[in-house]
Amino acid sequence: MLGAMAEEAVAPVAVPTTQEQPTSQPAAAQVTTVTSPSVTATAAAATAAVASPQANGNAASPVAPASSTSRPAEELTCMWQGCSEKLPTPESLYEHVCERHVGRKSTNNLNLTCQWGSCRTTTVKRDHITSHIRVHVPLKPHKCDFCGKAFKRPQDLKKHVKTHADDSVLVRSPEPGSRNPDMMFGGNGKGYAAAHYFEPALNPVPSQGYAHGPPQYYQAHHAPQPSNPSYGNVYYALNTGPEPHQASYESKKRGYDALNEFFGDLKRRQFDPNSYAAVGQRLLSLQNLSLPVLTAAPLPEYQAMPAPVAVASGPYGGGPHPAPAYHLPPMSNVRTKNDLINIDQFLQQMQDTIYENDDNVAAAGVAQPGAHYIHNGISYRTTHSPPTQLPSAHATTQTTAGPIISNTSAHSPSSSTPALTPPSSAQSYTSGRSPISLPSAHRVSPPHESGSSMYPRLPSATDGMTSGYTAASSAAPPSTLGGIFDNDERRRYTGGTLQRARPASRAASESMDLSSDDKESGERTPKQISASLIDPALHSGSPGEDDVTRTAKAATEVAERSDVQSEWVEKVRLIEYLRNYIANRLERGEFSDDSEQEQDQEQEQDQEQEQDQEQGQDRVSRSPVSKADVDMEGVERDSLPRSPRTVPIKTDGESAEDSVMYPTLRGLDEDGDSKMPS
């Protein structure tokens, strides 16, 4: 039995050593001649030790040539003008270009013009040219922690990271197939720190919110944080549709970008803030958008996400999870304090343009013809925000300080009763017959009428008789009634006409009917009834073309006036919202320093240069040759005609030697001091 084991031990050793017959045969002979079991085992071990290096050598011998014959790394060629040096890595190529070709100011060899290939970009600083060289060199040292994408410059990575703010579907979930074993089996793991772009301070998850139970498939653990851990079960955000008081992220982003562009136009003065038409056209682009300034949140840049749902199977359940918030990038046009102050001044000009222009206010349907619009805290409101129903903040055009019509004097306190409308404007507002001069016009009616009367009390024709109305004015009441549809719209009354039905039109000349008055003639003659005697609502016949045209025109005017008024209100409210947004940012100190803005401007300048380089544009700064320089070429080689000198006029104080009648001529061999004798 021991002999069989020895043979089995020797047999596998003899297989790989078949190539070397002289060495293997004596060893096998020695093993077969020994009869002791211990000696046999010792010989088998020695044979295996001797054969193992040979086997390893035979196995490694074909691998060594393969490694020696592998292709070398691809070399990178420097494409700088006049240089063709090859370098092994992008890092070495970048260092070569920066040190050899760009140089430094301290070594007196600084070159600020890129000569890579056909690029001739010129910068003003060495940092700019070194950052520009990264465009040509395939060096991408800056990697994104979220997706692993590499970038050449840090500003490119910074802009790329902002795009991950859109990833609001998956909150903190691992990728498929990369599940953490510590989360599966409840070990003391190190925690799954998934990369995220969320503000940790805005989403504190209390530690007592988790009710841990017996470990099941998903073991709740804590991330390695000093305090207040915010990682619990693996949970996903379920998109249950838009919430009632919250718009979607896409609409918020569109409004955010539109508002940033609007602030940029204000800074660059691309429209006149003193023009009502220009202001209205520019504000129209911001309407019907979900602007961050219209929300009641303290920080408009933050928008909450749907509440996450924990994925766990066990008798325990997670506590209430506050919804994390994603952070929109800051507005590039309102970063510094000076930007906020300047934009607030521009908005103030726009607000004054809308309020203080009489024509614009009258076109909006707020002012009446013949009245002057006064904007102050008495007739309007303390703030610039108009209420739902615009008050009549108008004063008379007389030179003295006339009283201001109160809002309650033009509207009935009850919305279910007809409102009082002013009488015809045929009466002069400056006369004593104006309803403004009545003491009843200045009384403020209480919100609820006291008494057992079911209907509101209306002023009679005798009210205020002793305070300005004469006996002749008793025939006409000082006020008329209007429907509830005319709540806030000012009626336009024509002067000197009565509001009555239009009389029926008749021919200019009518001949006398001389026919016999018999039965047949009576049947042939149609009976004409005056249209003014028939109620239009009870008129059975079809209206005439003039009536239809006039009615349609009046309806169109009312609709247009209503649209203009609503647009004016929207503009006023929007400007106030924008001013409140700027004021809140100034109060909270939400602005950056000027140094950060300068750095961002340099980065934007580098990005523009990179885009120009990719498009193949030649940005060499060349001084333009003017037409005058072209015309002056070759003038030095040509002889110019000498202009004759002006003969000076001899005065009384001049001597004969000073005055010369002829111009001075100089010879070739004279020094120019001698003069011709006169």
Curated annotation (Swiss-Prot):
Effect the entry attributes to changing residue 259 to R: Prevents intramolecular interactions, resulting in the 'open' conformation protein committed to processing independent on ambient pH
Zinc finger (C2H2-type): 76-101, 112-136, 142-164
Chain residues in the propeptide: 253-493, 494-678
Source organism superkingdom: Eukaryota
Region of interest (Disordered), ranges: 1-31, 51-70, 377-565, 590-678
Motif position, YPX[LI] motif 2: 662-665
Biased composition, class Polar residues, residue ranges: 379-401
First-listed, main subcellular location of the protein, grouped into a coarse class: cytoplasm
Protein keywords: Activator, Cytoplasm, DNA-binding, Metal-binding, Nucleus, Repeat, Repressor, Transcription, Transcription regulation, Zinc, Zinc-finger
Written domain comment of the UniProt record: Only zinc fingers 2 and 3 contact DNA. Zinc finger 1 interacts with zinc finger 2.
Name of the protein in question: pH-response transcription factor pacC/RIM101
Organism: Emericella nidulans (strain FGSC A4 / ATCC 38163 / CBS 112.46 / NRRL 194 / M139) (Aspergillus nidulans)
